[in-house]
């Protein structure tokens, strides 16, 4: 129903943001890391959304880019992990660390996320290892889109020892966040490179 909402970031709480668009102020629930990524109050933002609808409530969940939304939706496929729990997990681990832990079956890293014990971590690995939407999409696209625009950065990060598929996913995410904040990634490659290193580390 909603793919994204663009407007002025009019407020923040500990677990949500308010975005004003055409006289309507939307409350959108986000992870702690997304709260920081979306920038400061008063700026124009674009938030990718997912609508949670039950008989007794409707909630909008938001993400700074489409890749994080895909990861969130993957997490909600795990038995016992609902939307609020998925956001908590994404508040404790950045998407790169989370995807890497799921792909490598790293129980210890997954258990660092809020509310994730050994059993939940095992369920997450069983449900999602080798099945993450973002990494599968990178493979199916043949890495073409990133190769065209950001190949120098991808190559540099890969040579530093980071896994290429994870690098591509992160570079795409951060480039999209920069565009949403009004910054051109191609003109600010140093920032894109620096933020990618932080996200991958």
UniProtKB/Swiss-Prot annotation:
SUPFAM superfamilies: Nucleic acid-binding proteins, RuvA domain 2-like. Residues 1-64 are annotated as: Domain I. It holds the Pfam family RuvA_N. GO terms for biological process: DNA recombination; DNA repair. Signal peptide: none annotated. Residues 145-201 are annotated as: Domain III. Keywords: Cytoplasm, DNA damage, DNA recombination, DNA repair, DNA-binding. Gene3D superfamilies: 5' to 3' exonuclease, C-terminal subdomain, Nucleic acid-binding proteins. GO terms for cellular component: cytoplasm; Holliday junction resolvase complex. One of its GO terms (molecular function) is four-way junction DNA binding. Residues 65-140 are annotated as: Domain II. InterPro entries: DNA_helicase_Holl-junc_RuvA_I (IPR013849), Hlx-hairpin-Hlx_DNA-bd_motif (IPR003583), NA-bd_OB-fold (IPR012340), RuvA (IPR000085), RuvA_2-like (IPR010994). It is found in: Cytoplasm. The RuvA-RuvB-RuvC complex processes Holliday junction (HJ) DNA during genetic recombination and DNA repair, while the RuvA-RuvB complex plays an important role in the rescue of blocked DNA replication forks via replication fork reversal (RFR). RuvA specifically binds to HJ cruciform DNA, conferring on it an open structure. The RuvB hexamer acts as an ATP-dependent pump, pulling dsDNA into and through the RuvAB complex. HJ branch migration allows RuvC to scan DNA until it finds its consensus sequence, where it cleaves and resolves the cruciform DNA. Has three domains with a flexible linker between the domains II and III and assumes an 'L' shape. Domain III is highly mobile and contacts RuvB. NCBIfam families: ruvA (TIGR00084). Homotetramer. Forms an RuvA(8)-RuvB(12)-Holliday junction (HJ) complex. HJ DNA is sandwiched between 2 RuvA tetramers; dsDNA enters through RuvA and exits via RuvB. An RuvB hexamer assembles on each DNA strand where it exits the tetramer. Each RuvB hexamer is contacted by two RuvA subunits (via domain III) on 2 adjacent RuvB subunits; this complex drives branch migration. In the full resolvosome a probable DNA-RuvA(4)-RuvB(12)-RuvC(2) complex forms which resolves the HJ. Belongs to the RuvA family. HAMAP family: DNA_HJ_migration_RuvA. This is Holliday junction branch migration complex subunit RuvA. It comes from Treponema denticola (strain ATCC 35405 / DSM 14222 / CIP 103919 / JCM 8153 / KCTC 15104).
């Amino acid at each position: 129903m909603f793919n994204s909402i663009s407007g002025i970031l009019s407020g923040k709480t500990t677990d949500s943001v308010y975005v004003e668009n055409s006289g309507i102020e939307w409350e959108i629930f986000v992870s702690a890391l997304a709260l920081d990524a979306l920038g400061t109050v008063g700026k124009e933002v674009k938030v990718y959304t997912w609508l949670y609808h039950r008989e007794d409530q409707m909630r909008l969940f938001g993400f700074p880019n489409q890749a994080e939304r895909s990861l969130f939706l993957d997490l909600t496929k795990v038995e016992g992990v609902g939307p609020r729990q998925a956001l908590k997990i994404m508040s404790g681990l950045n998407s790169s660390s989370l995807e890497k832990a799921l792909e490598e079956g790293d129980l210890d890293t997954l258990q660092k996320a809020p509310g994730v014990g050994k059993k939940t971590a095992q369920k997450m690995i069983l449900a999602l290892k080798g099945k993450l939407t973002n990494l599968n999409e990178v493979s199916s696209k043949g890495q073409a889109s990133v190769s065209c625009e950001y190949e120098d950065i991808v190559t540099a990060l890969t040579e530093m020892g980071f896994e290429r598929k994870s690098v591509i996913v992160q570079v795409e995410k951060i480039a999209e966040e920069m565009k949403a904040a009004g910054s051109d990634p191609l003109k600010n490659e140093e920032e894109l490179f620096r933020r990618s290193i932080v996200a991958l580390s």
